[in-house]
């Protein structure tokens, strides 16, 4: 499966980015929390549009328990400088209430995903990082939603939700305290 190469591996930090909501944050800042990173683009992307309500729901439901959802806007079809207002408009259209950064040059997308997963079929992907900073679950792209357009999207949502619940129940361990 695309994404297996990153499972069980430390997540590299995403570097310096402009934050349009929340932030600035680094993975080091979030140690001790479960982090769901979603790479997304404009509402024209059907996968991004289809997954946005799920991100909002997971943030609403599990945020108080220690889940931090982080949106990483990646311009398409290729890296380009993106006006903050444009990204803010997308964030508003999606209804995001969690931290969102602009990854103009795709450096975070490359560090966390593309450089580590040579067979990646999607850029609209999600990584679930545990309290110690280890990638523990990957949604390699497309949509995950409880009321998704197909059986796979619904299964992927349930798998993400179950992984979040499992990681929230784990302790961070002595190295992170």
What name fits each language-model region?
Residues 1-28, 50:
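N-terminal "domain-start" segment that seeds a small globular fold
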Residues 25-49, 55, 69:
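Short active-site neighborhood of thiol/selenol oxidoreductases, capturing the structured segment around
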Residues 31-35, 64-68, 95-99, 131:
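Loop/turn elements at helix/coil->beta-strand transitions in domains of secreted/extracellular proteins
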Residues 42-45, 75-78, 105-108, 135, ...:
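Solvent-exposed loop/turn segments at secondary-structure junctions
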Residues 49-94, 105-111:
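Structural microenvironment flanking redox-active thiols in thiol-disulfide oxidoreductases
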Residues 95-99, 114-127:
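Structural micro-motif
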Residues 122-177:
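Thiol-/selenol-based redox modules, centered on thioredoxin-like
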């Amino acid at each position: 499966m695309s994404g297996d190469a990153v499972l069980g591996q430390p997540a590299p930090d995403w570097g310096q980015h402009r934050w349009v909501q929340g932030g600035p944050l680094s993975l080091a800042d979030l140690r001790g929390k479960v982090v769901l990173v979603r790479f997304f683009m404009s509402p024209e992307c059907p996968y991004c549009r289809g997954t946005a309500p799920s991100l909002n729901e997971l943030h609403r439901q599990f945020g108080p328990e220690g889940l931090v959802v982080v949106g990483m806007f990646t311009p398409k079809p290729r890296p380009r400088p993106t006006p903050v207002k444009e990204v803010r408009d997308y964030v508003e259209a999606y209804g995001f209430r969690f931290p969102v950064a602009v990854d103009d040059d795709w450096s975070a997308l490359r560090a966390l995903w593309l450089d580590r997963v040579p067979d990646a079929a999607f850029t609209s992907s999600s990584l679930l990082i545990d309290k110690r900073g280890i990638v523990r679950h990957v949604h390699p792209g497309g949509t995950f939603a409880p009321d998704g357009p197909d059986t796979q999207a619904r299964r992927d949502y349930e798998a993400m939700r179950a992984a979040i619940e499992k990681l929230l129940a784990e302790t961070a361990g002595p190295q992170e305290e």
